[in-house]
């Protein structure tokens, strides 16, 4: 899962929203460096990643990608699943996406102690409405382009959009089957 799904699943309180994002930016053991609510959300983020990586429906989705794209298929699928969530937001959330993202951006903008890499991208995330923009399929090309700049072999992501176009319907169906199970997992995750 990518940013939007983690934020959606991680809880709506400010500390939970922050921790849901921090999960991609904070590595190693958590030993009281953040408030308990933030650390709890980081732990949930990590557990969501493990649940997702081990789920048979995700294995099916990953197997749809060509062998040349398999190395980074997990990254591409995470981004695509955020697109599916944004596109079909009303099926999975009670509040409109624009209100949800506005709350996330408000919390993010008011936090002064963001992890270093998140602090660098947060202003761009807010200014360009990264989370809301996932509704538009073509935005994924920009997202994947940004990710590819951090990879050792960026050329392997170069044709990912062509593959996503080809796999759009089957991967969308994979998401429709998988996401409710992920919601149940997150809802039943033990909180501290």
What annotation goes with each model-predicted range?
Residues 1-93, 162-192:
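An N-terminal structural lobe/cap that precedes and organizes the functional/catalytic core
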Residues 99-184, 188:
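An amphipathic alpha-helical core segment
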């Amino acid at each position: 899962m990518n940013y939007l799904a983690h934020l959606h699943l991680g809880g709506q309180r400010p500390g939970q929203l922050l921790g849901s994002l921090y999960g991609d930016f904070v590595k190693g053991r958590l030993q009281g460096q953040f408030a308990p609510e933030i650390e709890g959300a980081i732990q949930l983020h990590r557990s969501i990643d493990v649940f997702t990586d081990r789920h048979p429906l995700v294995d099916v989705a990953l197997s749809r990608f060509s062998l040349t794209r398999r190395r980074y298929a997990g990254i591409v699928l995470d981004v695509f699943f955020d697109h599916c969530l944004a596109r079909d937001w009303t099926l999975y959330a009670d509040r409109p996406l624009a209100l949800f993202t506005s709350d996330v951006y408000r919390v993010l903008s008011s936090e002064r102690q963001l992890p270093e890499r998140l602090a660098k991208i947060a202003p761009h995330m807010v200014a360009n409405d990264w989370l809301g923009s996932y509704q538009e399929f073509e935005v994924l090309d920009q997202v994947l382009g940004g990710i590819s700049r951090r990879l050792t072999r960026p050329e392997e992501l170069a044709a990912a959009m062509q593959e996503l176009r080809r796999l759009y319907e089957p991967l969308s169906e994979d998401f429709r089957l998988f996401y409710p199970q992920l919601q149940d997992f997150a809802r039943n995750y033990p909180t501290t």
